[in-house]
Amino acid sequence: MKKNTLLNAELSYIIASLGHTDEITICDAGLPIPDRSQRIDLALIQGIPTFIDTVKATLAEMQIEGVIVAQEFKTVSPQLHDELMTLVQIEEELRGKPITISYIPHEEFKSHSHQSKAIVRTGECTPYANVIFQSGVVF
């Protein structure tokens, strides 16, 4: 369910069309995206847009109740992982309900991302900078 205004029409449409428990993936520039998945390619050049900016824009619009990240993200790219977790914590406080955080191996993450309604590719080039958001409800 949408919460605010987003300029990218494809991403805005996907968020507006999400039902409870539907998922979208926000990924770095290198995550493989299968042809059968809807790709929203925001990447312009290396680093633009960033993973965190894309997450912020998405969280401004999307009600989430679950987060899935690769286990490797926490150990290989701890600074970016911590930034993401801070944003999730803020979202949890705003929501007033807990947000489930799950860690799975990267290979499993790649397979799981194929179930997403859309995969949003950023210009991020930090290893394992990927997240799956599970849609919640605003009530």
Swiss-Prot record:
InterPro entries: D-ribose_pyranase, RbsD-like_sf, RbsD_FucU
Family annotation (HAMAP family): D_rib_pyranase
Cited NCBIfam families: PRK11797.1
Coiled-coil segments on the chain, per record: none
Subunit description: Homodecamer.
Designated name of the protein: D-ribose pyranase
Origin organism lineage: Bacteria, Pseudomonadati, Pseudomonadota, Gammaproteobacteria, Vibrionales
Function of the molecule: Catalyzes the interconversion of beta-pyran and beta-furan forms of D-ribose.
GO molecular function annotations of the record: D-ribose pyranase activity; intramolecular lyase activity; monosaccharide binding
Highest rank taxon of the organism: Bacteria
Any one of the GO BP annotations: D-ribose catabolic process
Any Pfam family: RbsD_FucU
Compartments it resides in: Cytoplasm
Keywords linked to the UniProt accession: Carbohydrate metabolism, Cytoplasm, Isomerase
Binding positions for substrate per the UniProt entry: 28, 106, 128-130
Family per record: Belongs to the RbsD / FucU family. RbsD subfamily.
SUPFAM superfamilies linked to this entry: RbsD-like
Pathway as given in its UniProt record: Carbohydrate metabolism; D-ribose degradation; D-ribose 5-phosphate from beta-D-ribopyranose: step 1/2
Catalytic reaction(s) noted: beta-D-ribopyranose = beta-D-ribofuranose
Catalytic residues (UniProt): 20
Entry EC number(s): 5.4.99.62
Enzyme class: isomerase
One cellular component term from this protein's GO annotations in UniProt: cytosol
